[in-house]
Amino acid sequence: LSQNKHLIHLVKEMNNYIGPKSDPEGKGHKMICIDGNIYGLTHELDEYVDYWIIQSYGSSNPGFDGYGVDPKKIICTENFEKYATNGGQLLKQAAAMPREGYKGGVGAYRFDNDYDNTPNYKWMRQAIQINQRVFNEWKAKQNEAENKPQK
């Protein structure tokens, strides 16, 4: 993908209509998300993309570093075409945080397959709760650091 000049051109042109560059006043826009192997694309396209979706299939540590983008724009995902019955590594991905900052979120390919679990969407519900908890913990640490008296 990194050598795909046509894809890079397409995403930049799409930003005339959708994506972050289509909304210079910040009034709201339709998002552009790129899902897949994002290495090599992030440097040239980061300002044109709202979220990068990394396929962390089967990985308990999705790794947010090394892409050259702010981790808050990265959503890590598990493969529920394969792991819907046991959740795979989704809960560990939900708990994972980058070294600096926070992640954009967590998700799953074919999370509709989680519907048949008991309760419905068993793994996705837990992942959302875990993701929210670790974000709130991160935010509390940020607030604590900001309110700490300077010596």
Language-model-derived ranges and their functions:
Residues 1-151:
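Secreted glycan hydrolases and related glycan-binding modules that recognize and/or cleave
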